[in-house]
Amino acid sequence: MAQLPGILRSLAWDHTGPPAVVDRLDDAMPAITTVPMATPVLALLEGSPHTGPWTLRWTSAGHPPPLLLTQDGQERYLEAGQGLLLGTPPGTGGGSRPNATEPLPPGSTLLLCTDGLIEVPGSDLDTGLARLRRHALALAHEPLDTLCDQLPARMPPGSTDDVALLALRLPSP
Protein backbone atom coordinates (compact mmCIF):
# COMPACT_ATOMS: atom_id res chain seq x y z
CA MET A 1 0.00 0.00 0.00
CA ALA A 2 2.88 2.40 0.74
CA GLN A 3 3.88 2.26 -2.95
CA LEU A 4 0.66 3.85 -4.19
CA PRO A 5 1.21 7.47 -3.04
CA GLY A 6 4.59 7.59 -4.81
CA ILE A 7 3.16 6.04 -7.94
CA LEU A 8 0.26 8.49 -7.85
CA ARG A 9 2.64 11.46 -7.59
CA SER A 10 4.68 10.21 -10.53
CA LEU A 11 1.56 9.77 -12.66
CA ALA A 12 0.41 13.32 -11.89
CA TRP A 13 3.60 15.02 -13.12
CA ASP A 14 1.97 16.50 -16.24
CA HIS A 15 -0.92 18.18 -14.36
CA THR A 16 -3.51 15.99 -16.04
CA GLY A 17 -6.90 16.21 -14.31
CA PRO A 18 -7.53 14.06 -11.23
CA PRO A 19 -9.84 11.49 -12.94
CA ALA A 20 -7.30 10.66 -15.67
CA VAL A 21 -4.46 10.32 -13.14
CA VAL A 22 -6.51 7.98 -10.92
CA ASP A 23 -7.51 5.95 -14.00
CA ARG A 24 -3.79 5.60 -14.87
CA LEU A 25 -3.09 4.39 -11.33
CA ASP A 26 -5.93 1.88 -11.58
CA ASP A 27 -4.53 0.59 -14.90
CA ALA A 28 -0.98 0.35 -13.50
CA MET A 29 -1.78 -1.33 -10.17
CA PRO A 30 -1.96 -4.95 -11.37
CA ALA A 31 1.37 -4.67 -13.19
CA ILE A 32 3.46 -2.85 -10.59
CA THR A 33 2.00 -3.59 -7.15
CA THR A 34 0.56 -6.46 -5.18
CA VAL A 35 -2.24 -4.24 -3.86
CA PRO A 36 -5.59 -5.66 -5.03
CA MET A 37 -7.77 -2.65 -4.06
CA ALA A 38 -7.28 0.87 -2.76
CA THR A 39 -9.31 3.98 -1.96
CA PRO A 40 -7.50 7.20 -2.91
CA VAL A 41 -8.79 10.69 -3.35
CA LEU A 42 -6.86 13.01 -5.64
CA ALA A 43 -7.61 16.70 -5.23
CA LEU A 44 -6.23 19.84 -6.82
CA LEU A 45 -6.74 23.28 -5.30
CA GLU A 46 -6.79 26.00 -7.95
CA GLY A 47 -6.65 29.75 -7.37
CA SER A 48 -4.37 32.52 -6.20
CA PRO A 49 -2.69 31.30 -2.98
CA HIS A 50 -3.50 34.39 -0.90
CA THR A 51 -6.56 35.97 -2.47
CA GLY A 52 -8.54 33.28 -4.29
CA PRO A 53 -11.05 32.64 -5.60
CA TRP A 54 -10.39 28.95 -5.00
CA THR A 55 -11.80 25.89 -6.68
CA LEU A 56 -11.31 22.28 -5.63
CA ARG A 57 -11.10 19.71 -8.44
CA TRP A 58 -11.12 16.10 -7.28
CA THR A 59 -12.03 12.52 -7.84
CA SER A 60 -12.37 9.74 -5.32
CA ALA A 61 -12.05 6.00 -5.73
CA GLY A 62 -14.06 4.76 -2.77
CA HIS A 63 -12.46 7.17 -0.30
CA PRO A 64 -14.51 9.06 2.30
CA PRO A 65 -15.74 12.35 0.80
CA PRO A 66 -14.07 15.66 1.69
CA LEU A 67 -15.87 17.66 4.38
CA LEU A 68 -16.27 21.41 3.78
CA LEU A 69 -16.79 23.69 6.79
CA THR A 70 -17.60 27.30 5.91
CA GLN A 71 -16.79 30.32 8.01
CA ASP A 72 -20.50 30.98 8.60
CA GLY A 73 -21.09 27.56 10.21
CA GLN A 74 -22.33 25.58 7.21
CA GLU A 75 -20.96 22.08 6.63
CA ARG A 76 -21.39 19.44 3.98
CA TYR A 77 -19.71 16.47 2.46
CA LEU A 78 -18.54 16.97 -1.12
CA GLU A 79 -19.91 13.79 -2.67
CA ALA A 80 -19.88 14.66 -6.38
CA GLY A 81 -16.41 13.13 -6.83
CA GLN A 82 -17.27 9.67 -5.49
CA GLY A 83 -16.35 6.72 -7.72
CA LEU A 84 -15.50 3.03 -7.52
CA LEU A 85 -12.51 1.66 -5.60
CA LEU A 86 -9.27 1.09 -7.47
CA GLY A 87 -9.03 -2.55 -8.47
CA THR A 88 -12.76 -2.94 -9.04
CA PRO A 89 -13.14 -5.51 -11.82
CA PRO A 90 -13.93 -4.12 -15.29
CA GLY A 91 -17.60 -4.19 -16.19
CA THR A 92 -18.69 -3.68 -12.57
CA GLY A 93 -20.28 -0.39 -13.55
CA GLY A 94 -19.57 3.20 -12.86
CA GLY A 95 -18.24 4.27 -16.27
CA SER A 96 -15.73 7.09 -16.23
CA ARG A 97 -14.42 8.59 -13.00
CA PRO A 98 -16.15 11.75 -11.82
CA ASN A 99 -14.38 15.06 -12.33
CA ALA A 100 -15.88 17.09 -9.51
CA THR A 101 -15.38 20.82 -9.00
CA GLU A 102 -16.45 22.94 -6.06
CA PRO A 103 -15.84 26.63 -5.35
CA LEU A 104 -14.37 27.04 -1.87
CA PRO A 105 -15.37 30.18 0.03
CA PRO A 106 -12.78 32.35 1.81
CA GLY A 107 -12.18 31.29 5.41
CA SER A 108 -13.51 27.77 4.83
CA THR A 109 -11.86 24.61 6.10
CA LEU A 110 -11.56 21.46 4.04
CA LEU A 111 -11.04 18.12 5.78
CA LEU A 112 -9.92 14.88 4.15
CA CYS A 113 -9.47 11.73 6.22
CA THR A 114 -8.94 8.03 5.92
CA ASP A 115 -11.75 5.65 6.73
CA GLY A 116 -9.93 4.67 9.92
CA LEU A 117 -11.11 7.92 11.47
CA ILE A 118 -14.79 7.21 10.83
CA GLU A 119 -15.15 3.43 10.84
CA VAL A 120 -15.60 1.70 14.17
CA PRO A 121 -16.54 -1.98 14.50
CA GLY A 122 -20.25 -2.31 15.18
CA SER A 123 -21.10 1.10 13.71
CA ASP A 124 -22.16 1.84 10.14
CA LEU A 125 -20.45 4.30 7.80
CA ASP A 126 -23.27 6.87 7.89
CA THR A 127 -23.05 7.01 11.68
CA GLY A 128 -19.30 7.55 11.47
CA LEU A 129 -19.67 10.32 8.88
CA ALA A 130 -22.35 12.05 10.97
CA ARG A 131 -20.12 11.83 14.05
CA LEU A 132 -17.17 13.32 12.15
CA ARG A 133 -19.38 16.13 10.81
CA ARG A 134 -20.71 16.97 14.28
CA HIS A 135 -17.28 17.05 15.96
CA ALA A 136 -15.63 18.90 13.07
CA LEU A 137 -18.29 21.59 13.14
CA ALA A 138 -17.77 22.06 16.89
CA LEU A 139 -14.04 22.58 16.23
CA ALA A 140 -14.35 24.59 13.01
CA HIS A 141 -13.19 27.92 14.47
CA GLU A 142 -10.23 26.45 16.35
CA PRO A 143 -6.70 26.82 14.95
CA LEU A 144 -5.91 23.98 12.53
CA ASP A 145 -3.38 22.31 14.83
CA THR A 146 -6.00 22.18 17.60
CA LEU A 147 -8.65 20.87 15.20
CA CYS A 148 -6.28 18.16 13.95
CA ASP A 149 -5.38 17.12 17.51
CA GLN A 150 -8.89 17.24 18.96
CA LEU A 151 -10.95 15.74 16.13
CA PRO A 152 -9.40 12.24 16.27
CA ALA A 153 -9.49 12.39 20.08
CA ARG A 154 -13.26 12.96 19.98
CA MET A 155 -13.92 9.96 17.76
CA PRO A 156 -14.71 6.66 19.50
CA PRO A 157 -11.86 4.25 20.12
CA GLY A 158 -11.76 0.85 18.49
CA SER A 159 -10.74 1.56 14.92
CA THR A 160 -8.48 -1.16 13.56
CA ASP A 161 -7.44 0.85 10.49
CA ASP A 162 -4.90 3.60 9.93
CA VAL A 163 -6.00 7.13 10.77
CA ALA A 164 -4.90 10.15 8.75
CA LEU A 165 -6.39 13.64 8.68
CA LEU A 166 -5.55 16.49 6.33
CA ALA A 167 -6.96 19.94 7.03
CA LEU A 168 -6.73 23.03 4.84
CA ARG A 169 -8.02 26.46 5.82
CA LEU A 170 -8.34 29.16 3.19
CA PRO A 171 -7.52 32.77 4.07
CA SER A 172 -10.39 35.01 5.12
CA PRO A 173 -11.14 38.09 3.03
Residue ranges and their predicted role:
Residues 2-173:
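Conserved subregion of the PPM/PP2C metallophosphatase catalytic domain
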